[in-house]
């Protein structure tokens, strides 16, 4: 990071969006001494949001996602930029570039792995050289999966053969998340969606790992929990992130295991529930893969809208990890969270 005095410790970009508003209120409530600001293109909306903050009212910075000068100004006056401006492949490319140039760390909550792959290809070497941290996917996608796997391995202090993660939870979906799903199918490299090691460095996985890491679509009984597994909608995002983390640790001689394999599923109590979820995901996949998918977009939640406060408060998530080690032992670890996983918990 460039050695310069900065006005703020944190700037939230895209603060007036659905998830950005939640983050703004959270920061105001929990960090009364933080030097921070909220940023976006609409001054009136930013002022209205800032006026809702009663403990630590943020400053306001104007910045449009298509205006490089404004974005670079934002990056030059803060240590960290936290972006909620999705779809990120449309609205955060210039922001990441400005953060890299101005020496500000960048974080977001994207689940758009194809876009993340582009970030890695374009910026990884420069970010490493400049000491800038570019950290996508810092929400429910993919923190529980990534951190849960990390702490599972570190707490055992053993080399691992495999981790199977089973996700369950309750909550809602915002229009921005749905828009991101539609957007990714229109992205220039959408044909890479099935690449199970999309985010890995070159030559960082074996044929055995590739064979055991194929995306899973079947329904199975989970003997350890007496429940059922189904395909998890965010597994294609989370698995790629965990596999990249494992590969990066391995490059630093501190890996999870030489042939480490990670897979992820949804956990449900009943077979019928697993069947319904699996069928629904197939239908959703067909809808967003159709050439005329945009005709179906009005059927879903609009950008800017999302779960009610009651739904967010009553939401929850559980991440369960079945870990098999190289000494042929099996362990179980669990992670819990209160609040809607994609919003309040995030």
Q: Where do the PLM segments sit?
A:
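Conserved glycine-rich Rossmann-like NAD(P)H-binding loop of the short-chain dehydrogenase/reductase
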Residues: 32-45
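Glycine-/Pro-rich loop/turn segments that contact NAD(P) or position catalytic residues
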Residues: 87-204
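Structural motif
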Residues: 9, 79-80, 105
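C-terminal catalytic/substrate-binding lobe primarily of soluble NAD(P)-dependent oxidoreductases
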Residues: 7, 154-346
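Conserved Rossmann-fold cofactor-binding substructure of NAD(P)-dependent oxidoreductases
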Residues: 62-91
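Short, conserved SAM-binding/catalytic segment
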Residues: 49-56
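A short, basic/flexible loop-to-alpha-helix module at the beginning of a structural domain
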Residues: 1-7
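N-terminal Rossmann NAD(P)H-binding glycine-rich loop of SDR-like oxidoreductase domains
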Residues: 8-31
């Amino acid at each position: 990071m460039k050695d310069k005095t900065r006005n703020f410790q944190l700037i939230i970009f895209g603060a007036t969006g659905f998830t950005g508003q939640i983050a703004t209120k959270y920061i105001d409530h929990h960090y009364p001494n933080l030097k921070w600001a909220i940023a976006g293109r609409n001054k009136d909306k930013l002022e209205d949001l800032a006026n809702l903050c009663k403990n630590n009212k943020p400053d306001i910075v104007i910045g449009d996602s298509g205006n490089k000068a404004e974005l670079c100004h934002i990056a030059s006056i803060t240590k960290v930029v936290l972006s909620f401006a999705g779809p990120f492949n449309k609205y955060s490319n210039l922001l990441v570039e400005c953060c890299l140039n101005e020496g500000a760390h960048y974080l977001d909550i994207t689940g758009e792995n194809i876009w993340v792959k582009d970030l890695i290809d374009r910026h990884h070497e420069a970010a490493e050289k400049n000491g800038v941290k570019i950290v996508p996917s810092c929400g429910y996608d993919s923190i529980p999966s990534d951190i849960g796997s990390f702490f599972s391995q570190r707490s055992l202090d053993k080399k691992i053969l495999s981790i199977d993660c089973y996700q369950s939870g309750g909550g809602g979906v915002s229009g921005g998340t749905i828009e991101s799903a539609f957007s990714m199918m229109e992205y220039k490299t959408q044909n890479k969606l099935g690449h199970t090691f999309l985010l890995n460095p070159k030559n960082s996985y074996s044929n055995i790992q590739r064979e055991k890491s194929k995306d899973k679509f079947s329904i199975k009984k989970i003997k350890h929990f007496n429940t059922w597994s189904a395909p998890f909608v965010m597994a294609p995002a989370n698995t790629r992130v965990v596999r990249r983390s494992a590969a990066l640790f391995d490059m630093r001689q501190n890996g999870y295991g030489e042939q480490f394999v990670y897979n992820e599923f949804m956990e449900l109590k009943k077979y019928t529930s697993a069947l319904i979820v699996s069928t629904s995901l197939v239908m959703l996949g067909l809808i967003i893969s159709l050439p005329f998918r945009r005709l179906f977009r009005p059927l879903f939640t609009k950008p800017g809208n999302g779960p009610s406060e009651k739904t967010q408060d009553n939401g929850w998530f559980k991440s369960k990890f079945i870990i098999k080690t190289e000494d042929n032992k099996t362990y179980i670890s669990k992670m819990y969270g209160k609040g809607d996983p994609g919003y309040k918990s995030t």
